[in-house]
Amino acid sequence: KVIGKALRSECHSGSKILHPVVHLHVMNPRKLLYLQKRPETKLIQPGKWDTAVGGHIAFGEDVKTALQREAYEEIGLKDFSAKPIGNYLFESDIEREMVYSFVSYDYKSINLHSDEVTEGKFWSQKQIEQNLGKGVFTPNFELEYVNQLRDRLF
């Protein structure tokens, strides 16, 4: 139940205000998972590989609308279909998120045109497994991969 709204800066200030976010994982037919590299200028986890799409749900916005908006803003995807993977609570030293996670196989129209993403590429399960725990990925991606994606997508 939503009980109010807060600025992104408040949510990421260490206040641990629980806030909703969407994640979209994009797979291709070869079972490769598309990840995006966060810019070095990001406050949280700069330069690390992360979920293809991730972003805050705006106050009054529904999950589906947020997913479509964030996918377009970050990787240029629009009018795609997505299946729910699940929801989970993520907590770090500075934030607490309710994550709504989805997967899409509509990968052909990925078009990076955002200052939110440095680069993107498809990763095999083996490549992901070899890099877990080495500081290559964001902690949130690693948690989601181990608890949700590993057994459901690969």
Whereabouts are the PLM-identified features?
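Acidic, metal-coordinating catalytic segment for phosphate/diphosphate chemistry
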Residues: 1-23, 27-29
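A short local loop/turn or secondary-structure capping micro-motif enriched for an aromatic residue
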Residues: 11-14, 41-45, 120-121
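A glycine-rich, hydrophobic loop/mini-helix early in the fold
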Residues: 21-53
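The catalytic Nudix box helix
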Residues: 34-35, 52-84
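Recognition helices and adjacent regulatory flanks at domain boundaries
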Residues: 42, 69-70, 100
